[in-house]
């Protein structure tokens, strides 16, 4: 299978540890005792890498890593057999705390400052990919670099002949379309925000997804949470019906969908199969505490129904 370099040039920058704390109720100003906790290597790019690995697709995680927290991330990926090509930075990789009580609260770390030498090192890694690679960029860039840095990084990949997948929001997503990404995946709310419209029917969603296609994307998936997902290609539009279940992990679900679609598309070039695997990965992660296991993904894949509109 084609090796995928799964790199998220910013959420890759923002490699993180997700520290998940479970507690009945948080009493502010009091000593609270957690019932259970989990620590995962996190960040959008890492999530993509971990799902690709479960699907048996060779990939390399890249980005910035630092400190004892960075070692935890690298060790976690090593344990899953994922290859890494990280740039070392001076400050610690951030920790994001997710408190799951009667309500869910997040406290996100700031993440390291990236200097010019470190950025140049990442640029060298991205410039060295081969024409049959796909590079996944995801999320917002570190604050000291800003999202404009993508306009510098994505062309480095495209000049090698490699494809890019761009999992961005808003203006950053629009700016990326000039590089003809293999896939972009805004959800319906992000699509509304981009065009400043209200989407009432599937036909509206398709109309604006086609506008994104016209601006340069090769495939556009609009995920609609409990209402399924729409894939728009130059040839056709496909709708994947929603699958019912209890949502536990909405954050990793989108990243899992990106991994499932990209991995299958690179293998088979079949957009319908790619959509099915994307929906299977996204849905099964949504119904899991951590990212979905391959067993659960395969089980969910058998429930995915796709119709051509």
Locate the predicted segments by residue.
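Charged helix-capping and loop-helix junction motifs
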Residues: 120-123, 146-154, 200-206, 240-243
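Conserved N-terminal subdomain of the carbohydrate kinase-like
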Residues: 54-133, 301-309
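Short catalytic helix/loop segments, enriched in acidic residues and glycine
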Residues: 24-45
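Conserved phosphate-binding/catalytic region of the ribokinase-like
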Residues: 202-309
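Conserved phosphate/ATP/ADP-binding segment of small-molecule kinases
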Residues: 151-235
